[in-house]
């Protein structure tokens, strides 16, 4: 039986997000639909993905998250406010921000913390590419960056039209997506970012949208009953260790040998730099990488 993992996101996700100004979540909902004066605006981005969006929108920040990943050059020397999952509230408060921009996957944990230091927060959704562009559109309206947002939306629409055109008429493969952590793995549904990419690529997730849950845990017998054509293996963290774990699991657990996807050589390890936990501007490269996996084409 599948068990929904209602609390797993706070343990797994470093930064994923939904934001459209019409449906933005913050401590003061009555304020979100009104544009703000950007001349003296003080913003803090608490995840790398949010910082990338702010950079593309040409927004200045006063603080940014600590990360081992890449931050836009313009933000590298800013005050660091800690990791995405656990920002330093004392540092945040000292920056006197007008808004703190954070992932809505962490809203249940972060919103009461932000409220405790009386800072406004906007929670964004990067669980899907569409959510990311809704976020961009909303931020553009709120922070007087509609021109920049419109250019990015046009870029997205153009890419997706061209991408989908080349798959017209092709049969949709059934796909099982596994998300690995060192020592364990779970199922990623199409409600997760990796699952969303598979859906955009034209694949059919054998676990659907998980009734809105990004991740499920299921036994291998249940997975086998779904008869996936393709198995994709992604890593939440420590990709080298996870890849070794998956290799050992598929080699030593006899049931995998009975999956048609395994028998047909349709098991693929995803590049963790493209297939991570939150939507970002590498989605186009990720979709191109999926093309030969799903359709056997280069």
Residue ranges and their predicted role:
Residues 20-23:
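C-terminal motif of bacterial Sec signal peptides marking the signal peptidase cleavage site
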Residues 41, 131-137, 141-144, 150, ...:
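Structured C-terminal subdomain patch of bacterial secreted/periplasmic proteins
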Residues 2-12:
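Bacterial N-terminal signal peptides that target proteins for export
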Residues 25-28:
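Bacterial signal peptide processing site
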Residues 88-102, 119, 219-233:
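Proline-aspartate-enriched helix->loop->beta-strand connector
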Residues 40-57, 148-202:
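Basic- and aromatic-lined ligand-binding clefts that recognize polyanionic substrates
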Residues 44-95, 99-105, 206:
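A short, structured surface patch at a secondary-structure boundary
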Residues 68-74, 186-215:
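Alpha-helical, coiled-coil/dimerization segments enriched in small aliphatic residues
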């Amino acid at each position: 039986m599948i068990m929904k993992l209602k609390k797993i996101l706070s343990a797994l996700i470093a930064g994923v997000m939904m934001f459209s100004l019409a449906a933005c979540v913050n401590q003061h909902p009555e304020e979100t639909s009104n544009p703000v004066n950007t001349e003296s605006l003080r913003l803090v981005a608490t995840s790398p993905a949010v910082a990338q969006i702010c950079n593309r929108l040409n927004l200045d920040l006063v603080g940014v998250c600590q990360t081992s990943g890449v931050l836009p050059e313009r933000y590298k020397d800013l005050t660091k406010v800690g990791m995405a999952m656990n920002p330093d509230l004392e540092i945040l408060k000292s920056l006197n921000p007008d808004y703190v921009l954070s992932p809505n996957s962490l809203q249940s944990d972060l919103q009461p913390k932000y409220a405790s230091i009386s800072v406004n927060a906007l929670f964004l959704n990067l669980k899907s590419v569409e959510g990311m562009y809704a976020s961009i559109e909303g931020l553009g309206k709120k922070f007087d960056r509609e021109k920049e947002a419109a250019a990015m939306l046009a870029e997205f629409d153009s890419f997706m039209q061209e991408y989908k055109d080349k798959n017209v008429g092709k049969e949709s493969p059934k796909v099982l997506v596994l998300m690995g952590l060192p020592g364990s793995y779970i199922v990623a549904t199409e409600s997760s970012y990796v699952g969303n990419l598979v859906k955009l690529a034209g694949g059919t997730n054998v676990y659907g949208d998980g009734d809105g849950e990004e991740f499920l845990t299921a036994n291998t017998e249940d997975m086998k009953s779904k008869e996936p054509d393709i198995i994709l293996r992604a890593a939440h963290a420590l990709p080298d260790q996870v890849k070794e774990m998956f290799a050992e699991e598929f080699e030593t657990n006899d049931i995998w040998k009975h999956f048609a996807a395994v028998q047909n050589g349709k098991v693929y390890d995803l590049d963790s730099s493209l297939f991570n936990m939150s939507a970002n501007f590498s989605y186009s490269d990720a979709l191109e990488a999926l093309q030969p996996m799903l359709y056997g084409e280069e």
